Amino acid sequence: MEAAWLDRFLGLLPRQSTVLDIGCGSGEPIARYLAEHGCKLTGVDSAPEMIAICRDTFAQQEWCVADMRSLSLRRTFNGILAWNSFFHLCPDDQRHMFSVFQAHAAPNTVLMFTSGPSFGEAIGTFEGEPLYHASLDGAEYRALLDKSGFAVVAHVMEDPACGRHTIWLAQHL
């Protein structure tokens, strides 16, 4: 389901790019897809058990236990991905994340993230457990991207070809 968007993301990157996967979870299916397409990954997740799975499954890649909100790796990447992770932060933390994206971006860095379709907060469920979701509105995401030096390349709300995800693809100027 994500392959078409991941291909768009990869299409904007140089070959054998470095990619920062923020909120990588277990690495399936996103990290696997990117690694199979030649990317050198640095995955970050706040859950040690998720990073342990990544280290076992993708030993050639770099994995870090860290809170995305305070992430400071002191280096930049060709690509930054926050797929199905960023929207679990409250609105104020999402606003702050744009400085984190900017700190890890070089000229031409490609950023892709998922959000909700409109401003609001909701509690969903995942594997029977409550799961928090939040979103800013589209105009605010655009303003934050612009302020952080990113230009929107593509934005689709509730993409029917991608599980109704709302997707943002941008490039650092």
Where are these regions (language model features)?
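Acceptor-substrate binding/catalytic loop of class I
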Residues: 124-139
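Core SAM-dependent methyltransferase catalytic element
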Residues: 157-173
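Class I SAM-dependent methyltransferase SAM/SAH-binding core
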Residues: 20, 26-70
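A conserved beta-strand element that flanks and buttresses the S-adenosyl-L-methionine
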Residues: 81-82
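A short glycine-rich, Lys/Arg-flanked "PGG" loop and its adjoining helix->strand segment in the class I
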Residues: 95-107
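Short "lid" loop at the C-terminus of a central beta-strand within the Rossmann-like core
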Residues: 116-121
